[in-house]
Amino acid sequence: MKRVLTAVVAATALLLAGCGSGADDDRKPATGASDAAFPVTVGSVTMAERPQRIVSLAPTATEVLFAIGAGPQVVAVDDQSTYPADAPRTELSGFKPNAEAIAAQNPDLVVISDDLDKIIEQLGKLEIPVLFAPAAKVLDDSYREIDQLGTLTGHRSESAALVARMRGQIDKIVKGVPARADALSYYYEIDQSLYSATSRTFIGSIFSLFGLANVADAADPDGAKNGFPQLSQEALVAADPDLIFLADTKCCGQSPATVEARKGWSTITAVEQDRIVALDDDIASRWGPRVVDLVQSVADAVAKIPA
């Protein structure tokens, strides 16, 4: 259930250590950017100079910061920022943010994806700039946040290059999958209690690139469940998806083998035809640079099925 709550929190703001550098840690100035580009403003955040002590409480933002070359400016990331491996992971939490612990890092910029416990207001009282980068609903949201992070950190050219590269790669992948007359259906699993994500979510929008029909849509037609409904086994079996995608392999130990062993699932087409795709939980729950890998995984699965 914790994974489901994580997904819902992210959608309404979209999935889930050792100690990092302390507040007295000297950071080397970032290269490849000019201080002449400052001051800069993104939304309500203005940076008079390039930040050198960034704290990221959002795994996606952490991935973006390192992808655009701002890694040397990051002094601490939250406990869910598992990538890249050299990110300064700490016990800081984006789900239970502690203003005092964050301030102890002496940050000149904090990045969050959820304003839980009014952390923006709390840090504002401490005069700490905060960029709110909520969960993307569509790819354009992801591209916009990458651009914002590039602007605030002094890496505009790098962020622009990353967005262009992502757009090009995704476009090439999607166009490389042959069109089909009849849409394939799929079930996306958040956890084994049958929570899923509908087409209204960011993850759903990725599958929609391939014209796939989401069997979870019927369980949340008006979006009252924030795009993350729990399906009944009866409904899922009746929907008979052509494909099953598992986003609970790392968290919950699910695999094609465990799905095949589930009672009553043997008649589902995806199970009968061995079309169960194991995804990396982290990649499947974030909206940063590695979304390209997710798009490729979906493309590979679809391409294997004769049109």
Regions found by a protein language model. Give the residues of each.
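Extracytoplasmic substrate-binding proteins
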Residues: 119-195, 225, 274-307
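Alpha-helical, coiled-coil/dimerization segments enriched in small aliphatic residues
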Residues: 79-83, 88, 200-227
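A ligand-binding cleft/hinge motif common to bilobed small-molecule-binding domains
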Residues: 117-125, 238, 242-262
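A short, structured surface patch at a secondary-structure boundary
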Residues: 53-115, 212-215
